[in-house]
Every structure is written in C-alpha cells, then in structure tokens.
Design a protein with these regions (language model features):
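Hydrophobic core
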Residues: 21-25
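Non-catalytic all-alpha helical scaffold/repeat segments
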Residues: 26-430
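Intrinsic structural disorder
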Residues: 1-5, 424, 431
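N-terminal export and membrane-targeting signals
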Residues: 1-18, 270
Length: 431
C-alpha cells in the first residue's frame, strides 16, 4: 500500500495564497460588477498580512512567471491581472483594506535580497526577484499620482516603510544618481515614486526609523565588504561614507519637506523624527542589525525587516546618540579610519600623528594586541564633537591630516548629493 504524504508547510502556504488569489480575483470582480462595496479581497489580504510566504505568493505567484537572464522577474498573466485588480480598485469604499494591502506588501518585501542557504532554507530561488517585482509595483502605486499624503493612515505609513526599508539599493540609488535597477523599473518604478513615498510617510517617527534601519544595514554591508578587501584604502572608506551621507541627507530633506508643508517646520516633532532616524541610520550603518536587542531584532528576518519597527525600541537597543547626526557621521568616519589602520605609524611629514593624539581621548580604545578597536556606535554627542575638534586642531601630521580631511570632504559631498537629489533630480510629488 502506498503511504499518503502529509503536505509540507510550504505547500500549505502556497495553497492558502492561491486560494486567496483565486477567491479575491473571482469574487472581487463579481462584486464590482454587481456594484457591491464589499468583497472578499479585504478578507484575503487580512488573512495573509502576517505571513510573508503567503504574501509573496499572493502578489507574485512562483508558478506564474519566470526569472530572465538579468535576474528580473517576468510575471505571467495571472499576476498582471491581480495587480490590475488591486491598483484599479476603489479603495475609498474599502479604506481599511489599504491597511491590509500595505501589510501584505510589507511582509512580501522581507524576501528582498535573500537566497536559499543553510540558515535560510525556506527561501525559494526566485523569491528575491519576485519580491523586487512586488516592491516595485507597490512603491510605484503608493508613490504615484493616485494617492496623496492625506490618504495615508499611520498604519499604512508604517507598513510602507517596511517595503522601502527592504529596497535599500533603490533608495541609495535615488539619493545619489536616480538610476534604478531593472528588477524594479520593470514594475514601473521611478525614482520620483520613491521620493514621493518617503515624503508621504516622512512625518511618522516609527516609519522613518524603520526605513533608516533597513538603509543602515545596507550601507553597513557595503562598507564591510569594501573594507574587508586587502587592497582597500582611505578612498574606498571615503566613497562608502559619501554614500551613507547622501542617503542620510536624502531622508532628512524629504522628511523636512513634509513637516514644512504641514506647517510644522522646525517643530520639536520634526527635530525628533529627523534626528532620531538619522542617528539610527548612523548606528546601524556602523554596527549592523546585530546591534539590536532581541526585543527589537524580533522584527527582522535575516537581514531584512518583516514588520514595522517601534522607534523607541530601536533607540533603546542602540543607545542612539542624542548629538547632531551630521557631526556624528563625520566622527564615525574618522574613528573607522583608525580601526581600519588607515593612518601612518612612521610618517616623517611632521606634526602629531592621528594614532598618537587619539589615545588622549575617552572614546579611544584598543584591543589586546594594541590596535585601535573603537566602538563607533557608542560615541556620545559630546564625544562626536570632541572627535571633530581632534581632527581640526590636534592632528598636525600632514599625511594623517590629509586622510581626515578627505573623509570630511566625502561626507560633505554626500550631504550635497542627497539634498540635491531630493530637491531637484528626484523631487517628490508634494501632495
């Protein structure tokens, strides 16, 4: 007798998502034809909003499409019809449904930049490409002309921040040059959509903290990969910090636009939201998501974010500095230069060397071998200001001074890049 096999969790997930897809398409279209203001789509979305596997299968079914030679997801007709139904729906008759839809897109986005591995075995080989397509469609839709900031509930803001946080390469590209990858542009996404979406949730502290966390992790990974190269030098570190500064300035400018348009310019709410999010970006950029405690890190899946983060939990976990984020980022770059051994130990260019003068400060620490091992995330606001003064006044060796000045100029240039992108190249729809 042949033994019956039990369905696996993955098969059950696919079955649930497919049922939601078929029922949602069928009954949803019938209800609209009958003029009904209620259908099963809301129920289907609500049922899978906290299930990333089912959410991804609903928005980009694995069996309905393929990955092309460039790694881009090419959807089938069922997927196209699904998105046509979702994006043409009269959501004003289903306002709670937008909360559910954004929860589903946020959950699905947690498969961005993930691949099958021993530590992540349930991820399919197509998951990243499918999630990129779903994120592109979602960001294009909610950042497009069909919505305004007034349409966004606080729940929508937090959910959509997860989508953007899990699309950090697109945010970073929009901050410096505006050229997005094929995986999202094939779904209709433009850099202006990203700017508009961030602008629309830019007044929500939890949403901005969530975005800053995802973006910080992206820059942390890039910096770590770059500087682990044996041939890496101060130019590579400077380029990395220029990109961090551009992302930071881009977020700051878009959030400040939102507060200004709401007649809250320079308010305490603006200062708290902006400074907190940028300080989180700095801290996670330096240490990565591993710096979060179990409570705050419970929202992550691998190196992505599965649910909106709570700002207070993140800042409590990081012990985020209350100082000026811009000064803090510059100080981090100087300290990183010390940690990576980019300063001279025998320069004959005169003056006091960086490594010698740094030892006089309370932020300086060494490992057991006597090498600099400074915790860049632990710098207080006063210590960051002290590090800036150290660069300016105490390091007089011309070789070391040149490295510090180049890092300083890189961050200044990145700050300009991000601001220019938000104000001109990729200016948001300020509606």
């Amino acid at each position: 007798m042949r033994r019956k096999t039990r369905p696996t969790a993955k098969h059950l997930t696919v079955a649930v998502a497919c049922l939601a897809l078929v029922v949602g398409l069928g009954r949803g279209l019938i209800s609209r034809m009958n003029g009904s203001t209620s259908d099963s789509v809301d129920e289907a979305l609500t049922a899978i909003g906290d299930d990333p596997q089912a959410a991804l299968e609903y928005l980009a079914p694995e069996e309905d499409g393929n990955v092309d030679k460039n790694g881009t997801w090419v959807p089938g007709q069922t997927t196209v019809d699904q998105w046509t139904m979702l994006t043409s729906r009269n959501w004003h008759k289903h306002t709670p449904g937008l909360d559910a839809l954004t929860a589903v897109t946020g959950a699905a986005s947690s498969f961005r930049n993930r691949a099958p591995s021993e530590s992540d075995p349930d991820v399919s080989a197509t998951a990243d490409a499918r999630a990129a397509y779903a994120c592109g469609r979602a960001m294009s839709y909610f950042g497009g002309e069909g919505f305004t900031k007034k349409d966004f509930t606080d729940t929508m803001k937090r959910n959509l921040s997860v989508v953007v946080a899990n699309s950090p390469e697109e945010v970073a590209d929009a901050a410096v040059k505006g050229a997005l990858g094929a995986g999202v542009t094939s779904a209709g996404l433009e850099a202006t959509d990203i700017s508009s979406l961030i602008y629309r949730f830019g007044d929500n502290q939890d949403a901005m903290t969530t975005l800053a966390t995802g973006l910080g992790q992206y820059h942390h990974n890039k910096l770590k990969e770059t500087m682990n190269d044996p041939d890496a030098n101060e130019n590579d570190l400077g380029d990395g910090y220029r990109q961090v500064a551009a992302s930071s300035s881009y977020l700051r400018t878009l959030s400040e636009f939102r507060f200004a348009d709401d007649k809250k310019k320079d308010s305490e709410e603006q200062k708290t939201t902006v400074d907190t999010s940028l300080s989180v970006l700095n801290a996670v950029g330096a240490a990565g998501l591993t710096a979060l405690t179990d409570e705050a890190a419970a929202f992550t899946a691998g190196s992505t974010i599965a649910k909106p983060l709570v700002s207070s939990q993140v800042t409590d976990a990081l012990g985020t500095s209350t100082g000026d984020p811009y000064t803090g980022l510059k100080a981090q770059s100087y300290v990183a230069g010390l940690n990576y051994g980019l300063f001279s130990t025998d320069s004959d260019k005169g003056g006091r060397r960086a490594i010698d003068t740094a030892k006089d400060h309370d932020w300086y620490h060494e490992d057991e071998d006597g090498n600099p091992a400074i915790d860049t995330t632990a710098l207080t606001g006063d210590q960051a200001s002290d590090a800036a003064a150290w660069r300016e006044h105490q390091v007089t060796n011309s070789d070391d001074k040149g490295v510090l000045n180049d890092l300083d100029l890189s961050i200044t240039a990145g700050n300009t890049d991000g601001e220019d992108s938000a104000k001109t190249r990729n200016e948001p729809r300020r509606t």
